[in-house]
């Protein structure tokens, strides 16, 4: 940090984080800006995933309840239609096998169920992948922001020692600016990293529960399909 610029900030009596950023050393300024961007990015991902994962689980649960209550036709997909309901997509994935179940010969039952199982597995993987898309950014921000902030801290402390060496003075006016930069970089690194790590772990758990719910419903569908193929209408 430029000592004169820091002195001006104190003289004006209006010291703030923004002024510290504007008066910072170019390298530290780049670090601080990168951390601010990372923090904004992580909160954008957190907001989007909070609603995306919660909404996906709610819709899948609604279809599962409708299926067991005999109202699955309300969600039936027509050719060319798309849906954001994972439960409806699971049922659509085996719709052909579901229709054919009552007409295939006993020797074809195993092949029909195996084909349906592959379709369900692919659909579950695809749906979980769609909802989890972007969550890796939280892991990246959480693991790297602390080290980026640490780099800014080291650079700020180095500037403090350089100022001491150049001015042969250890007063607060000489070292205060670079030390403030160093602490600011550390703080921003933690501000960016901590929420990212917390929400990454939360969303990972939510996604695992979502995948387990879809897997359980897939197994229920396979059981019903197998019974339908063996016994006719249920």
Predicted regions located by residue number:
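Hydrophobic alpha-helical transmembrane segments and adjacent short intramembrane/lumenal linkers
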Residues: 168-182
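Short, strongly hydrophobic alpha-helical membrane anchors
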Residues: 1-24
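Residue-level signal for the membrane-embedded core of alpha-helical transmembrane segments
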Residues: 31-34, 38-41, 145-148, 152-155, ...
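Hydrophobic alpha-helical transmembrane segments of polytopic membrane proteins
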Residues: 179-198
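Transmembrane alpha-helix/interfacial motif
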Residues: 24-70, 74-76
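Residue-level signature of catalytic and energy-coupling elements of molecular machines
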Residues: 25, 43, 75-76, 91, ...
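Membrane-interface helix-boundary signature
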Residues: 18-31, 132-138
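Predominantly long cytosolic amphipathic alpha-helical stalk/bundle segments
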Residues: 3, 57-171, 198-234
């Amino acid at each position: 940090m430029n000592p004169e610029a820091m002195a001006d900030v104190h003289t004006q009596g209006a010291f703030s984080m923004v002024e510290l950023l504007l008066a910072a050393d170019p390298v530290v300024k780049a670090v601080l800006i990168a951390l601010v961007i990372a923090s904004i990015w992580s909160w954008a991902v957190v907001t989007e995933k909070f609603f995306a994962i919660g909404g996906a689980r709610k819709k899948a649960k609604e279809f599962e309840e409708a299926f067991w209550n005999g109202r699955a036709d309300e969600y039936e997909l027509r050719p060319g239609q798309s849906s954001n309901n994972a439960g409806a997509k699971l049922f659509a994935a085996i719709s052909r096998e579901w229709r054919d179940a009552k007409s295939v010969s006993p020797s074809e039952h195993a092949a029909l169920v195996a084909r349906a199982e592959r379709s369900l597995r692919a659909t579950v993987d695809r749906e979980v992948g769609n909802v989890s898309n972007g969550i890796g950014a939280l892991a990246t921000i959480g693991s790297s922001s602390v080290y980026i902030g640490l780099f800014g801290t080291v650079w700020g402390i180095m500037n403090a020692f350089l100022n001491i060496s150049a001015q042969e003075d250890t007063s607060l006016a000489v070292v205060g600016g670079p030390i403030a930069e160093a602490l600011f970089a550390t703080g921003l690194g933690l501000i960016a990293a901590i929420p990212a790590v917390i929400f990454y772990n939360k969303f990972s758990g939510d996604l695992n529960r979502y995948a387990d719910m879809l897997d359980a419903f897939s197994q229920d569908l396979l059981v019903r399909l197998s019974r339908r193929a063996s016994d006719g209408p249920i």
